[in-house]
């Protein structure tokens, strides 16, 4: 959404009803979302004809589908409304709630867990495919550990991202990285968010 600058221009009711009745492959999913949208609109006093979002019916800063809006959106600033459409504070709190929930990860976000660690292959030109989102990759003995963190002993989700320039620099991601991808299923998105968060820590003294 370009940090909330573009949240979509399609009426959510149009997007969901079109997909629910004219898209057989995902009909069950979108019929459920249409029902959730009507329930959400009643609960939050929305005008169903005015709410706009993405082509798939996702809404607001966080681009939540209606079911996740109902289950996971928070009134983070405690003003009496769960507003991820226009309220950045509510949106940020709601995304954090998503990551900590079963939707984000079967075990939820681990507050003290790492997201991704830099690692260097012990041999040059090592051929390793990214294991992102697939089976845990447990051959970590081929890497040098370049951080103060220990590589995890039990792998929930391990992802390897070769550096495009050096080819022998890797990032090893654990289940917190995987949780980010449950919000957006792009490995590049997840790594971008992680690296941006690290820069924010530096500049804001977090």
Please provide the spans of the model-predicted regions:
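Extracytoplasmic/secreted proteins, especially bacterial periplasmic and envelope-associated proteins
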Residues: 11, 15, 29-36, 60, ...
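Short, functionally critical alpha-helical segments immediately adjacent to catalytic or ligand/cofactor-binding
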Residues: 1-4, 37-42, 95-97
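C-terminal functional modules
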Residues: 146, 153-206
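Catalytic cores of secreted/periplasmic lytic hydrolases that degrade extracellular macromolecules
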Residues: 29, 33, 43, 55
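Secretory-pathway/luminal and periplasmic proteins that interact with or process carbohydrate-rich
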Residues: 1-11, 21-27, 43-49, 63, ...
């Amino acid at each position: 959404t370009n940090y909330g600058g573009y949240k979509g221009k399609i009426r959510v009711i149009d997007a969901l009803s079109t997909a629910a009745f004219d898209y057989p492959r995902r009909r069950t999913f979108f019929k459920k979302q249409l029902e959730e949208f009507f329930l959400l609109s009643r609960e939050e006093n929305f005008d169903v004809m005015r709410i706009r979002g993405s082509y798939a019916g996702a809404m607001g800063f966080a681009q939540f589908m209606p079911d996740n809006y109902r289950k996971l959106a928070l009134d983070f600033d405690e003003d009496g409304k769960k507003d991820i459409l226009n309220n950045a504070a509510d949106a940020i709190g709601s995304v954090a709630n998503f990551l900590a929930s079963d939707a984000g990860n079967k075990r939820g976000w681990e507050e003290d867990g790492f997201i991704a660690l830099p690692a260097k292959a012990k041999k040059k030109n090592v051929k390793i495919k990214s294991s992102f989102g697939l089976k845990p990759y447990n051959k970590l003995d081929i890497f040098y550990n370049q951080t103060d963190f220990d590589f995890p002993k039990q792998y929930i989700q391990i992802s390897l991202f070769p550096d495009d320039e050096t080819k022998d620099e890797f990032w090893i991601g654990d289940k917190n990285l995987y949780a980010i991808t449950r919000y957006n299923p792009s490995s590049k998105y997840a790594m971008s968010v992680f690296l941006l968060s690290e820069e924010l820590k530096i500049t804001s003294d977090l």
